């Protein structure tokens, strides 16, 4: 099946789920950053809500007054197939992806449409690989999950770091993330859904391992180890059971530049040991409560989908990820940093990922690919121009 020609489609980019909390932030970012001549549209279930969003966008970006609005619903696969067939790149913020995501992935894979999401749900991503990787490879579609704070800073940060180390040598990288940010109802819902399904998550991972090719003559690892004390970052490292190490490992498996023997470990960097211990215990308690349906509903009700931090709270938020790396006798520390990670910077990362797929000169890839593999330096440059900092730390 040849790669499908998408150049004659009605739109360069469509944002699906535009009226949600993160979707509206992404729409606002696109409104002020799409290049001249970009053909883009907003999509969602409610035309009335889409019209309200378009009116708000037009107040600061008058050209948005005539922005096309497309009605589509995750419960109506036919509407999603039409959506995918009309655009070159489809961006979605509609989660939890385990509940709402697969019909759109299937539609994009079949139509040869590039797909970008914010998914941090390992089970969903593994299932999409097993079910739709072959179709996407055949059609030429690039399926790029985890294109927000999960997992762009880590994926591109490690790629940036590896590029500063000698080639052809074993490489070790430890990532330490710190932030003061809040989160939204949609994020809480997705996290609780994922935490409530440990057995299903493990089963999906095994199914993927059975069919996914492994690098030949190279070793790639992302172990989940014990807490560590990092003298370089002056923090306690609490292991994070997030998707990010898996994404980094998949980039390393796909790119020879990561060396013959690559290892990545992923931590929350915490200044004081009691806080580290308390955070680990608290996360464990939430995961335990997520197994009980009534407790999960109670936790989910603390924040409704569509709710999120205020603009004032987001303005005070920040993130820093430090990478302590070594290889070939070279040791260095790099850092990726920016503002509010969960929303303002996530909207930026998602939007720039979509714009990169739509307009940048990128390597020929297809199927389920990471941001480091699909966009690499092009996306890093975009994010640097947009204010996210990549650099070497001078100790």
Language model: regions and residue ranges:
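C-terminal catalytic/substrate-binding lobe primarily of soluble NAD(P)-dependent oxidoreductases
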Residues: 2-6, 163-395
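Structural motif
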Residues: 12, 88-89, 114, 332
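N-terminal Rossmann NAD(P)H-binding glycine-rich loop of SDR-like oxidoreductase domains
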Residues: 12-31
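A short, Lys/Arg-enriched amphipathic alpha-helix followed by its capping loop at the start of a domain
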Residues: 29-37, 255-256
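Conserved glycine-rich Rossmann-like NAD(P)H-binding loop of the short-chain dehydrogenase/reductase
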Residues: 35-49
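Short, conserved SAM-binding/catalytic segment
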Residues: 53-64
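Conserved Rossmann-fold cofactor-binding substructure of NAD(P)-dependent oxidoreductases
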Residues: 70-89, 93-99
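Glycine-/Pro-rich loop/turn segments that contact NAD(P) or position catalytic residues
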Residues: 97-210, 243, 250
């Amino acid at each position: 099946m040849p790669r499908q020609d998408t150049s004659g489609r009605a739109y360069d980019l469509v944002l699906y789920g535009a009226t949600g909390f993160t979707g509206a932030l992404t729409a606002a970012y696109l409104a002020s950053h799409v290049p001249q001549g970009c053909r883009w549209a907003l999509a969602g279930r409610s035309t009335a809500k889409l019209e309200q969003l378009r009116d708000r966008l037009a107040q600061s970006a008058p050209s948005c007054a005539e922005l096309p609005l497309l009605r589509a619903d995750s419960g109506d696969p036919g509407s999603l197939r039409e959506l995918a067939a009309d655009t070159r790149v489809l961006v979605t913020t509609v989660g939890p992806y385990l509940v709402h995501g697969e019909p759109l992935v299937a539609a994009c894979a079949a139509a040869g449409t590039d797909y970008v999401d914010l998914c941090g749900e390992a089970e969903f991503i593994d299932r999409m690989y097993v079910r739709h990787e072959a179709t996407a490879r055949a059609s030429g579609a690039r399926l790029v999950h985890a294109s927000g704070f999960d997992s762009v800073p880590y994926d591109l940060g490690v790629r940036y770091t590896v590029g500063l180390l000698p080639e052809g040598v074993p490489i070790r990288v430890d990532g330490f993330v710190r932030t003061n940010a809040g989160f939204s109802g949609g994020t809480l819902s997705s996290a609780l859904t994922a935490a409530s399904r440990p057995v299903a998550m493990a089963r999906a991972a095994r199914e993927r391992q059975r069919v996914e090719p492994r690098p030949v003559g190279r070793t790639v690892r992302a172990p989940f180890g014990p807490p560590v004390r990092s003298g370089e970052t002056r923090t306690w490292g609490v292991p994070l059971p997030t998707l990010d190490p898996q994404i980094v490992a998949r980039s390393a498996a796909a790119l020879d530049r990561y060396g013959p023997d690559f290892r990545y470990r992923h931590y929350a960097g915490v200044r004081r040991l009691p806080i580290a211990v308390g955070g680990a215990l608290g996360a464990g308690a939430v995961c335990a409560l997520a197994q009980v349906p009534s407790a999960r509903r109670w936790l989910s009700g603390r924040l409704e989908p569509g709710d999120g931090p205020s603009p004032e709270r987001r303005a005070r938020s920040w993130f820093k990820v430090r990478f302590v790396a070594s290889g070939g006798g070279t040791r260095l520390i790099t850092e990726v940093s920016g503002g509010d990670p969960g929303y303002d910077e996530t909207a930026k990362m998602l939007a720039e990922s979509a714009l990169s797929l739509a307009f940048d000169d990128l390597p020929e890839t297809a199927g389920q690919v990471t941001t480091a593999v699909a966009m690499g330096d092009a996306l890093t440059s975009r994010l640097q121009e947009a204010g996210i900092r990549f650099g070497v730390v001078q100790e």
